[in-house]
Swiss-Prot record:
Positions contributing to Mn(2+) binding: 136, 160, 162, 164, 243, 245
E.C. code: 3.5.3.11
Record has Methyltransferase as a keyword: no
Protein name: Agmatinase
Similarity remark: Belongs to the arginase family. Agmatinase subfamily.
Encoding gene (name): speB
Class of enzymatic activity (EC top level): hydrolase
Keyword Manganese: yes
Cofactor(s) this protein cannot do without: Mn(2+)
One BP term from GO: spermidine biosynthetic process
A GO molecular-function annotation: manganese ion binding
Catalysed reactions listed for this entry: agmatine + H2O = urea + putrescine
Lineage of the species this protein comes from: Bacteria, Pseudomonadati, Pseudomonadota, Betaproteobacteria, Neisseriales
Function comment: Catalyzes the formation of putrescine from agmatine.
InterPro entries: Agmatinase, Agmatinase-rel, Ureohydrolase, Ureohydrolase_dom_sf, Ureohydrolase_Mn_BS
Length: 322
């Protein structure tokens, strides 16, 4: 049977990497946007994977269920061409759902190496990564692997309510509020080329990163925010990380450390959709904690953000710049 004639469970029945199958949105295997579940990365442009870790949270746990929730929320996006793009990204972009990173949660010292090796395996194939957390700590080992692949320092585009640059000089700690302190100290990211968007918690030392706080975004507007991001990052290889608590709790209650005054979903989506000029080398969406969600609106927002990231990658491939 040809792939276009498959009805249901295309994630495990589809033979090719491209195109979409016909699915019921309320049934079937929950890969991200119904992509093939596969660890075969030959010819793959982007590998989606999850890191179900929430051992480093400082308030509410539950982000370990984030990858599963984002996949479940994505099924409605696989039914139609994404708005406002007007195309099926999977006609041109080869995307697989690689499954989840395995780690031993009862042996914390092995978690960081496990995530690094997971990322190295994917990046060595030539595929780019779109990763779902899990808490935000996962971005730190992902940055290590991406800096090995693409050279350091990288630029960082960081959407969040928190700066995550609180001091932490322990090499073995698991803390979702200190990753970018370590990333700057270790030369993984260039603070002068990095931008944090949506910040609305205080830190005495922002480590030299350029901060566009949530009040700044509200006062100056989305277009000015996009312009500042592009001006600061330029053509540097950039890793994009989106902590869902960048959004206001009214739009994303399902997260571990919500902070009032955040971006609206519309603001965030417009920013993401206008990042096509950036040299994006890796992406993640983290901190979705579905046990605190209402009507799945947080997971749905995360799935839309991730879908827009893939649409950016599709356009880059079509333009020959992926």
């Amino acid at each position: 049977m040809s792939d276009e004639m498959i009805y249901g469970d295309g994630a495990i029945r589809r033979q090719g990497l491209y195109g979409s199958s016909i699915e019921n949105t309320y049934a079937g295997v929950l890969s991200f946007m119904r992509r093939n579940y596969s660890r075969d990365l030959e010819g793959v442009d982007v590998a989606v994977s999850g890191i179900p870790l929430d051992l480093s949270v400082t308030f509410r746990s539950g982000a370990r269920m984030g990858p599963q929730a984002i996949r479940a929320a994505s099924v409605q996006l696989a039914e139609l061409k994404p708005y406002p793009w007007g195309f099926d990204p999977f006609e041109d972009l080869a995307v697989v759902d690689y499954g989840d990173c395995w780690f031993d949660a009862h042996n914390p010292l092995t978690i960081k190496p496990s995530i690094i090796e997971h990322a190295r395996t994917i990046l060595a194939s030539g595929a780019k990564m779109l990763t779902f957390g899990g808490d935000h700590y996962v971005t730190y080992p992902l940055l290590i692997a991406h800096a090995e692949k693409y050279g350091k320092p990288l630029a960082l585009l960081h959407f969040d309510a928190h700066c995550d640059t609180w001091p932490d000089d322990s090499p073995d700690s698991l803390n979702h509020g200190t990753m970018f302190y370590k990333a700057v100290k270790e030369g993984l990211i260039d603070p002068k080329k990095s931008v944090q968007v949506g910040i609305r918690t205080w830190n005495d030392d922002f480590m030299g990163l350029n901060v566009l706080g949530a009040p700044w975004v509200h006062d100056n507007g989305v277009d000015a925010t996009i312009a500042e991001i592009k001006k600061t990052i330029g053509d540097a290889p950039v890793y994009v990380t989106f902590d869902i608590d960048c959004l206001d709790p009214s739009a994303a209650p399902g997260t571990g450390t919500p902070v009032p005054g955040g971006l609206t979903t519309a603001q965030a989506l417009k920013i993401i959709r206008n990042l096509g000029d950036l040299n994006i080398v890796g992406m993640d969406v983290v901190e979705v904690a579905p046990s605190y969600d209402q009507s799945e609106i947080t997971a749905i927002a995360a799935a839309h953000i991730a879908c827009d990231m893939l649409c950016l990658m599709r356009n880059k491939k079509v333009a020959g710049t992926l």
